[in-house]
């Protein structure tokens, strides 16, 4: 479809060739159609008509003077005037007119509402599509707000997480410290035990050495005569013991 | 006052000024330019929907080169439909009943398609003169026949439209006269004839739309062959 662009100020300035940039720059704003924005909205419905062709304004116009029947009287009078004065002559075209009029009225009455709803549906679909885009955008933005609020709530609980982590770290440090303390204690004990054992060993060795020396010296000091005397003494003691035992046994 | 039934087809003039110019310019008035709005009123919506749909349908079988003709064919269709339908109203003059107008549409447009075909793809354009699968002995005869068929196309286009509309209008006038004359004498017969007139008017409405559509469709077909 061809659109007619009406520029205000369509003067000699615009009569140049299309290559001249100056043409567009010199278009005045307050006269061009851009100054009319925003465009006032179109009326929702067309003008009211009675009987399909006579606008309601005619009836409103005549009502103060002639009442409700005024326009009808006017119409009838006009028709009869034209017929009687033979301004309009009834001929074969009248019947052709009646016939085509019947076809038109039948068509409008039968298909009018459906065509109107069809046209409305086309427009409504357009509006619905745009509305859907708008609704989706709004829904996604609202969802974004909800998500942001949730994140903020999550952030509030963050200190609990930090406390738990801090506890964990403290525990680890404590455990580590105790382990090391334990290790140190063990090491020191080991060293000290060693020293103690060493001293014990010394003492034992000294003791054994002394005992050995004493035994050696005693053994060396036992003369053979003393040895014989001790053996004889032992034998006599044994005999005495044997006797006492026998005597105890017989009693 | 009509002298003969053919006076309705005389090109009207008033004080030497031809009225046919007004009759031809009238359809333009009836289609308002869509305003620069997103949502329009019902009339503009329907008008826009119809033109879009029609042009889409018409351009379906055409390749991209043929789409250059979209504006011409769509506007031609709207023009012819409006003129034909307006001609059905009483006391109107239908410009498409004039053979001169219809030939003025048919010959240049048909010639344009032929010249486009001959210039851009002469082999294919000439190849259309021989349908596929013809038996060999028939080829010379068929070429002659196809050439005649090609050359008669503009004549057929123009005369088809003229004849259909003229015949329809004439019939309407005749039967309406019959009703008019019979009404005082034999009212019953007049009423039956009036019924016939009603049916004929319905037919004429259909013919008006169909003939315009056929004109444009055939042109698009010729274009399809050649572009």
UniProtKB/Swiss-Prot annotation, chain B:
It is found in: Mitochondrion inner membrane. It is a multi-pass membrane protein. Its main location: mitochondrion. GO terms for molecular function: proton channel activity; proton-transporting ATP synthase activity, rotational mechanism. The keyword Ion transport applies. The chain crosses the membrane at residues 9-29, 69-89, 98-118, 135-157, 179-199, 202-222. GO terms for biological process: proton motive force-driven ATP synthesis; proton transmembrane transport. The keyword Ubl conjugation does not apply. Gene3D superfamilies: ATP synthase, F0 complex, subunit A. GO terms for cellular component: mitochondrial inner membrane; proton-transporting ATP synthase complex. InterPro entries: ATP_synth_F0_asu, ATP_synth_F0_asu_AS, ATP_synth_F0_asu_bact/mt, F0_ATP_A_sf. It catalyses: H(+)(in) = H(+)(out). Keywords: ATP synthesis, CF(0), Hydrogen ion transport, Ion transport, Membrane, Mitochondrion, Mitochondrion inner membrane, Transmembrane, Transmembrane helix, Transport. Belongs to the ATPase A chain family. Subunit a, of the mitochondrial membrane ATP synthase complex (F(1)F(0) ATP synthase or Complex V) that produces ATP from ADP in the presence of a proton gradient across the membrane which is generated by electron transport complexes of the respiratory chain. ATP synthase complex consist of a soluble F(1) head domain - the catalytic core - and a membrane F(1) domain - the membrane proton channel. These two domains are linked by a central stalk rotating inside the F(1) region and a stationary peripheral stalk. Component of the ATP synthase complex composed at least of ATP5F1A/subunit alpha, ATP5F1B/subunit beta, ATP5MC1/subunit c (homooctomer), MT-ATP6/subunit a, MT-ATP8/subunit 8, ATP5ME/subunit e, ATP5MF/subunit f, ATP5MG/subunit g, ATP5MK/subunit k, ATP5MJ/subunit j, ATP5F1C/subunit gamma, ATP5F1D/subunit delta, ATP5F1E/subunit epsilon, ATP5PF/subunit F6, ATP5PB/subunit b, ATP5PD/subunit d, ATP5PO/subunit OSCP. This is ATP synthase F(0) complex subunit a. It comes from Cyprinus carpio.
